[in-house]
Amino acid sequence: MRGPIDRITAPLPGAWRTTVDWVLTIVIAVAAVLAIKQWVVNPYRIPSSSMEPTLHCARPGAGCEARYSDRVLANRFIYHFRDPRRGEIIVFDTPPKAVQQCGAGGTFVKRLIGLPGETVREDDRGNLYVDGKQLDERYLDPERKREDSGNPGTWHVPQGEYFMMGDNRAQSCDSRRWGAVPRDNIIGKVFAIYWPPQRISFIR
């Protein structure tokens, strides 16, 4: 049985048919890759230290140079079927206020802390509470947590929005400064580190 490409190219002479076969194959492959990036999985580079120690921006002492930063994959499809969950690392477009507060905006990667309608509180020791219950944040570096202990505050998360924070709290410009993130701004869930080779792993 002939496939779609065979049916298109059958009337052509041999040499031309081979050329058209290759062109059609490349076009289909490119279209498939673009569709996957748009709707299923997309790669991102970690440009800062705001998610240390979970996601690295560079080798120790090297600064956040592009060739050393973690590259991650985000599942763009999952949130079409369910809502984001607390503790997930999420890729999202920042609200406009982020540019004013942080000097930068665009696409950020942070951890989801507060869900719609909840109240998030950070005490003077860097502990987080959601609706009065302390979060178990084993993913934090204790030393970095102590560095952030001088920034207590309380924030209410509006309906339809999500409160995002970096794991490296003292070096993270996040929802504490520019507010919660609307549901429509959320792009996807980070599920894996794919570069550099020694850092390849899945993220729960």
Locate each region found by the language model.
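Soluble "head" domains of membrane/secretory-pathway proteins
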Residues: 1-31, 35, 39-204
